[in-house]
């Protein structure tokens, strides 16, 4: 279980004060403009609690790719109107996905990704390779 360190988005900032177990990552995405930090990390068993860090989504994804396992990028689906700037790309850890299922006849088509902790995420079809 490899750990990687990031700078938690806080005021005031503190260096390397968030160490996460990469095996516990569900998915990663760029933070919404109304949140602190550049990147939001969703962890296993945390429910709606997220961890915002000051590093860019590219830096966080790159650090995750150096550890065992991989991430799969896809476009998030929103039931509500999309945020300004459009839909975000989410990077999902397939090892923590219990199943995926299509939601037809929704328009546009999307998939429901169910994680091992019972949480769910919707992604726009087609489902990317690796999920």
Which residues make up each language-model segment?
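Acidic, Ser/Thr- and proline-rich intrinsically disordered linker/docking segments
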Residues: 1-19, 23-131
């Amino acid at each position: 279980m490899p750990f990687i360190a990031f700078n938690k988005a806080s005021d005031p900032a503190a260096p390397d004060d968030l160490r996460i177990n990469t095996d516990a990552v569900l998915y990663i995405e760029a933070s919404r403009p109304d949140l602190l930090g550049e990147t939001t990390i969703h962890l296993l068993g945390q429910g709606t609690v997220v961890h915002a860090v000051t590093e860019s989504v590219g830096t966080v994804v790159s650090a995750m790719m150096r550890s065992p396992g991989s991430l799969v990028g896809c476009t998030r689906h929103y039931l509500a109107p999309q945020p300004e700037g459009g839909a975000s790309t989410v990077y999902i850890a397939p090892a923590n996905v219990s199943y995926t299922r299509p939601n037809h006849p929704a328009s546009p088509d999307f998939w429901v990704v169910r994680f091992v902790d019972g949480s769910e995420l919707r992604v726009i079809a087609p489902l990317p390779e690796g999920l």
